[in-house]
């Protein structure tokens, strides 16, 4: 049987049962109706529980604007400073660094950061962060914290349109998401490799099915029913291409054999919100290994794959329920990717 459309191979549950779930962030308030800070740590690749570790840190919290008579949309009454009012929720990715302290010290240092926020626009809408009051616990991330940071607004803010342009805005950290990295590295497939198209190849893509602890339909993320009749979500990632000698036919059995030899293990992390980590513990073909820069661990941040889905579920519980390998013929080389809605060189449209 040759592959002309798509074929599916379902991985055994043992490939994701150990590290395929994320606990939710608890949103609790104290007697003063202030949100109680919390740190959540996920371990990828068997890192040490204490002592020197490599941590990827992702801050979550609320945007707060200066109060005035005018009213803007707000998401909560969880006010910290009476002169400021919550106007949205969002995040601040800090990245990976080596950390030697304990979790609670890191949480305390993060909640004491003085973060000013500005909304602007370049090629896309951006959020600008300026950070002061950096405690020693956060010095490993100081190279980013001491400089202004810009991020795509649709990746770090749930509702960027609610951030006013004529008032001061602060970002108040409530939650700290950490991914502790052991022997696993944070390798991300380069965009040039992800867009690679070669003749006589089969594209191996992964479809990851997840369930979450919140209702997402009202937030524009429609859940579907799985084979058990339960609501679930899914997203896709690209693993790479496999190639046969010219004239040899691809079969479903051949592709399944290739993927089974790789012995893939799947984990969920908190890089950029929610992230998928794939670890190849078996043998990899030379063609595919070269596309992966001969790395065996790949990180797929949902922030880059599906920003809106990431924004909706990044604080909730997430659990992998199924992973499928999708075998699809590689797109012909003459197909072109159009990232811009306006096509260049067509009619009266000028480049």
Curated annotation (Swiss-Prot):
What does the UniProt function comment say about this protein? Plays a crucial role in virus assembly and interacts with the RNP complex as well as with the viral membrane.
Supply the source organism for this entry.
Bovine parainfluenza 3 virus (BPIV-3)
Q: What is its main location?
A: virion
The answer to keyword Ribosomal protein applying to this record is no
**Superkingdom as given in the UniProt entry:** Viruses
The name under which this protein is listed is Matrix protein
Q: Where in the cell is it found?
A: Virion
Of the GO CC terms on this record, one is: viral envelope
Keywords from the UniProt entry: Viral envelope protein, Viral matrix protein, Virion
Molecular function GO terms recorded: structural constituent of virion
What lineage is this protein's organism placed in?
A: Viruses, Riboviria, Orthornavirae, Negarnaviricota, Haploviricotina
Range of residues in the leader sequence:
none
Which pairs of positions does the record mark as disulfide bonds? none
Q: Tell me its family.
A: Belongs to the morbillivirus/respirovirus/rubulavirus M protein family.
GO terms (BP aspect) = virion assembly
């Amino acid at each position: 049987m040759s592959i002309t459309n798509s074929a599916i191979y379902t991985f055994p549950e043992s490939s994701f049962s150990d590290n395929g779930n994320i606990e939710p962030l608890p949103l609790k308030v104290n007697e003063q109706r202030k949100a109680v800070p919390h740190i959540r740590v996920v371990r990828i690749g068997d890192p040490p529980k204490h002592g020197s570790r490599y941590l990827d840190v992702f801050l979550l919290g609320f945007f707060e604007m200066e109060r005035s008579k005018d009213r803007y949309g707000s998401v909560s009454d969880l006010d910290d400073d009476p002169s400021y009012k919550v106007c949205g929720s969002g995040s601040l990715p800090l990245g990976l660094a080596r950390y030697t302290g304990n979790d609670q010290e890191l949480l305390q240092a993060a909640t004491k950061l003085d973060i000013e926020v500005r909304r602007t626009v370049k090629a896309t809408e951006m959020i600008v962060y300026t950070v002061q009051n950096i405690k020693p616990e956060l010095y490993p991330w100081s190279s980013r914290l001491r400089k202004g940071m810009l991020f795509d607004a649709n990746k770090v803010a749930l509702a960027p349109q609610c951030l006013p342009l004529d008032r001061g805005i602060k970002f108040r950290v409530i939650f700290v998401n950490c991914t502790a990295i052991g022997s696993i590295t944070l390798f991300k497939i380069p965009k040039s490799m992800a867009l690679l198209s070669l003749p006589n190849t089969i594209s191996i893509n992964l479809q990851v099915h997840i369930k979450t602890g919140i209702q997402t339909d009202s937030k524009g993320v429609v859940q579907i029913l799985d084979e058990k009749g339960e609501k679930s979500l899914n997203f896709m990632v690209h693993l790479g291409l496999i190639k046969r000698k010219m004239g040899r036919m691809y079969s479903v059995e051949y592709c399944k054999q290739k993927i089974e030899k790789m012995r893939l293990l799947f984990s969920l992390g908190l890089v950029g919100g929610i992230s998928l980590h794939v670890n190849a513990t078996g043998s990899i073909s030379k063609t595919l290994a070269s596309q992966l820069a001969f790395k065996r661990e790949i990180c797929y941040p949902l922030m880059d794959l599906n920003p809106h889905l990431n924004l909706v579920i990044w604080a909730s519980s997430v659990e992998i329920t199924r992973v499928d390998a999708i075998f699809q013929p590689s797109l012909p080389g003459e197909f072109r990717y159009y990232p811009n809605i306006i096509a260049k060189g067509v009619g009266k449209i000028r480049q």
